[in-house]
Amino acid sequence: MSLLTPDSGLLFWMIVSFGIVFVILSKYGFPVIVKAIEQRKAYIDNSLETARQANERLAHIQAEGEKMLAEAKEKQNAVLKEAFAEKERIIEEARKKAVSEAHLQIEEATRRIREEKEKAIREVRSEIADLSIAIAEKVMKEKIGRDKEQQQMIDRLLDEVSFSKS
């Protein structure tokens, strides 16, 4: 048991040596250790603050990116709607123009047909009149000598004219 209970002299020198070591450490060792711990703590705190700021900036940048993406999609939709409306307007305008041009062409064709018809009728009437005059001249030359036949022909022509007028 003597090993477990130290001598008083040994105890004294252990306390003195421990006190000297403690004084030396407290004067030279602990301040360096405490300073290193405080520097490490400051470095860690600074790193945490920098990381927090970086996370905030990243979140802000992500929010801006999402906002810009939403704006771009909105602009894209607006441009697509505008392009669709423009396409519809152009198609409608082209359709109206085509219908208008078709009506103009139909009217022009109708007018030309009418003119050609009137011209043909005039030509036919002119031909009929010329033929009638030629036939009348031949008939008149033949019958000019016979008074009775001439009178009958005049009466017959007058009757035909009066019937056609009624």
UniProtKB/Swiss-Prot annotation:
Record localization: Cell inner membrane
Domain of life: Bacteria
Key word Transmembrane present: yes
Record-annotated membrane-spanning stretches: 10-30
Membrane topology annotation: Single-pass membrane protein
Chief place where the protein resides: membrane
SUPFAM superfamilies tied to this protein: F1F0 ATP synthase subunit B, membrane domain (SSF81573)
Family: Belongs to the ATPase B chain family.
Role, per record: F(1)F(0) ATP synthase produces ATP from ADP in the presence of a proton or sodium gradient. F-type ATPases consist of two structural domains, F(1) containing the extramembraneous catalytic core and F(0) containing the membrane proton channel, linked together by a central stalk and a peripheral stalk. During catalysis, ATP synthesis in the catalytic domain of F(1) is coupled via a rotary mechanism of the central stalk subunits to proton translocation. Component of the F(0) channel, it forms part of the peripheral stalk, linking F(1) to F(0).
Oligomeric form and interacting partners: F-type ATPases have 2 components, F(1) - the catalytic core - and F(0) - the membrane proton channel. F(1) has five subunits: alpha(3), beta(3), gamma(1), delta(1), epsilon(1). F(0) has three main subunits: a(1), b(2) and c(10-14). The alpha and beta chains form an alternating ring which encloses part of the gamma chain. F(1) is attached to F(0) by a central stalk formed by the gamma and epsilon chains, while a peripheral stalk is formed by the delta and b chains.
Protein name: ATP synthase subunit b
